Amino acid sequence: EYIVLDDGWMAKERDKNGNLVADSIKFPSGMKALADYIHAKGLKFGIYNCAGSKTCAGYPGSRGYEYQDARSYASWDVDYLKYDWCNTEKLNAEGAYITMRDALKAAGRPIVFSICEWGDNQPWKWAKDVGHAWRVTGDIINCWDCEVGHGSWSSWGIWKIINMRKNIRKVAGPGH
């Protein structure tokens, strides 16, 4: 039902007014045209950004631009936001996600808010009141029971994830 663009859809810098802009080579018609195309196919359009100053791949993050970015997403008719946790400079996770939640609400368009915090700050204790969906680990990797380090972060196999997070099943439910 959703087509979600992950990290790297935007230009390396914001425009002169501080707005996010699409990478003009990857998306020459921009995000609104892409959203219109996806919606015309009967699908919903999702986009990625990050609570930090930069995304995981080094593109502009939303820190300090939450309300401006939320207005952009609404003007592009975005239906879903995956909001990652890279380059967060010791931000308070719950507070950072509340700020974007409030910005999305203020933008006036219903946007599913997916909290991609990796479980480091125990989102199972607060995320259900902040977003529509939340993760509890880092990235899933194509293996059954393994962990692969990537420097400052790791990926896990599904069995390892199940065993790591089995004690939080009581807080799981539809949308979480």
Indicate where each model-derived feature is located.
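Extracellular/periplasmic catalytic domains that process cell-envelope and extracellular macromolecules
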Residues: I38-A40, A74-S75, K105-G108, A127-K128
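Short secondary-structure boundary/capping segments
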Residues: N17-V21, S62-R63, A96-M100, A127-W134
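Extracytoplasmic, non-cytosolic globular domains
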Residues: Y80, W85-G119
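Generic structural hydrophobic/aromatic packing signal, biased to beta-strands
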Residues: I3, F45, Y73, M100, ...
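Glycan-recognition surfaces
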Residues: Y65-Q68, V112-H176
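Generic recognition of stable, solvent-exposed alpha-helical segments in well-folded globular domains
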Residues: S29-A33, Q68, L91-G95, T99, ...
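Feature targets compositionally biased, intrinsically disordered low-complexity regions
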Residues: N17, S29, F45, A107, ...
